């Protein structure tokens, strides 16, 4: 879930902290990528629907390969642009997330029932919508994704808990420049730079959204502690929302009272009853001090691709097109042997112009709003681009 409504709120309150970029603009950058989120996106993007049945991208043996196809293609695309991705995988979820995970399971079960109901009614549009809501990333898909990345020579990090928190740790300690994820809580965990839409296909022509935490804090006048409290009030994975407290009330509450404690004291509890399990102090502590492996203990190494291993895994086991795999290996080798060309901004000290706080700045007219974050079905182009694979009815 991330942080509910935070993206739109930042566009409203701190638009200067947000930039739209092209992939090529991140040349030379190390980016810590939320691997589980990326794999989920690839599966959703390649999930089709036809004749009342959900379709998966499979090979000739019937093995689902959408996660490997997407990961292989997008990683190569980043490598081509001189980007150095570091994939971070989720570990054990914190106890605070138990209720959220149970709610997700219930929603998936509801989607299954809604799918069957729509099927009986012959509602293809509703069936396709519900089919995508039942998608889950399996343990086998995670393990295969790790294997592929290691064979490609791309660093893989196993987080002890939340991947976004581990990614933020790498950024805060200078091991990576930004976190690549759709979950806005990467900022709440303290990542100084966050990138959204990093894994969306170039064919959609959707820009990558770059958000700078320091500029958010400077423009809004919030401290980091207050920003964390704001995110908790907006709605996060670890505590329920306070009824009737939307983005604007949460924003005004933190601006006026400075903390969740003082804000709750001001509330009319008959209108806004605080849930008994609103353990905001525990959520705050987790955001401020999450379970991570210290960046200093992580050795990040990019290595040459394992050509024999890639051919064995992708071509012989997963039945990928040999020509496609060989071309991918050539691109990986070229990137590994390419002489490092530094970014211009590494040679200069760049001084940022101070920005006004929210109170001092006049309202901005015509501020750009974020685009819809829905995933668009593009199975047709993907089918064409992945020779040797086909759409098959999900068993």
Curated annotation (Swiss-Prot):
Cofactor note: Binds 2 magnesium ions per subunit. They probably participate in the reaction catalyzed by the enzyme. May bind an additional third magnesium ion after substrate binding.
Gene designation per UniProt: FEN1
Compartments, as annotated in UniProt: Nucleus, Nucleolus; Nucleus, Nucleoplasm; Mitochondrion
Native source species: Leishmania major
Gene3D superfamilies: 5' to 3' exonuclease, C-terminal subdomain, 5'-nuclease
Reported modifications of this chain: Phosphorylated. Phosphorylation upon DNA damage induces relocalization to the nuclear plasma.
Protein family membership: Belongs to the XPG/RAD2 endonuclease family. FEN1 subfamily.
Protein's name according to its UniProt entry: Flap endonuclease 1
Complexes and interactors: Interacts with PCNA. Three molecules of FEN1 bind to one PCNA trimer with each molecule binding to one PCNA monomer. PCNA stimulates the nuclease activity without altering cleavage specificity.
Binding site for Mg(2+) 2: 183, 185, 237
């Amino acid at each position: 879930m991330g942080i509910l409504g935070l993206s739109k709120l930042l566009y409203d309150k701190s638009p200067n902290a947000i930039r739209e970029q092209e992939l090529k603009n991140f040349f030379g950058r190390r980016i810590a990528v939320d691997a589980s989120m990326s794999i989920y996106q690839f599966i959703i993007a390649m999930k089709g629907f036809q004749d009342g049945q959900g379709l998966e991208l499979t090979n000739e043996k019937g093995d689902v390969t959408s996660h490997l196809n997407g990961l292989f293609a997008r990683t190569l695309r980043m490598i081509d642009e001189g980007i150095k991705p570091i994939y971070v995988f989720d570990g054990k979820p914190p106890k605070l997330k138990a209720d959220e995970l149970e709610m997700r399971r219930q929603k998936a079960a509801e989607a299954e029932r809604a799918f069957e109901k729509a099927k009986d009614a012959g509602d293809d549009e509703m069936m396709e919508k519900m089919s995508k809501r039942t998608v889950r990333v399996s343990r086998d898909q995670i393990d295969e994704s790790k294997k592929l990345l290691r064979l490609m020579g791309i660093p893989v990090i196993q987080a002890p808990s939340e991947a976004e928190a581990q990614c933020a740790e790498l950024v805060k300690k200078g091991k990576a420049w930004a976190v690549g994820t759709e979950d806005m809580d990467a900022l709440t965990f303290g990542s100084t730079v966050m990138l959204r839409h990093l894994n969306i296909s170039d064919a959609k022509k959707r820009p990558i959204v770059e958000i700078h935490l320091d500029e958010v804090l400077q423009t809004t006048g919030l401290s980091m502690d207050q920003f964390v409290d704001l995110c908790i009030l907006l709605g996060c994975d670890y505590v329920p929302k306070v009824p009737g407290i939307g983005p604007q009330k949460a924003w005004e509450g933190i601006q006026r009272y400075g903390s969740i404690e003082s804000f709750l004291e001001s509330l009319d509890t008959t209108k806004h009853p605080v849930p008994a399990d609103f353990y905001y102090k525990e959520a705050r502590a987790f955001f401020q001090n999450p379970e991570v492996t210290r960046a200093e203990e992580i050795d990040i190494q990019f290595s040459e691709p394992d050509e024999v291993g890639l051919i064995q895994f992708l071509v012989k086991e997963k039945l990928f097109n040999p020509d496609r795999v060989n071309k991918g290996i050539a691109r990986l080798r070229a990137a590994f042997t390419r002489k490092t060309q530094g970014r211009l901004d590494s040679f200069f000290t760049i001084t940022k112009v101070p920005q006004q706080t929210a109170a001092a700045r006049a309202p901005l007219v015509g501020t750009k709003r974020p685009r819809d974050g829905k995933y668009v079905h593009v199975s047709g182009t993907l089918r064409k681009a992945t020779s040797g694979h086909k759409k098959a009815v999900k068993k």
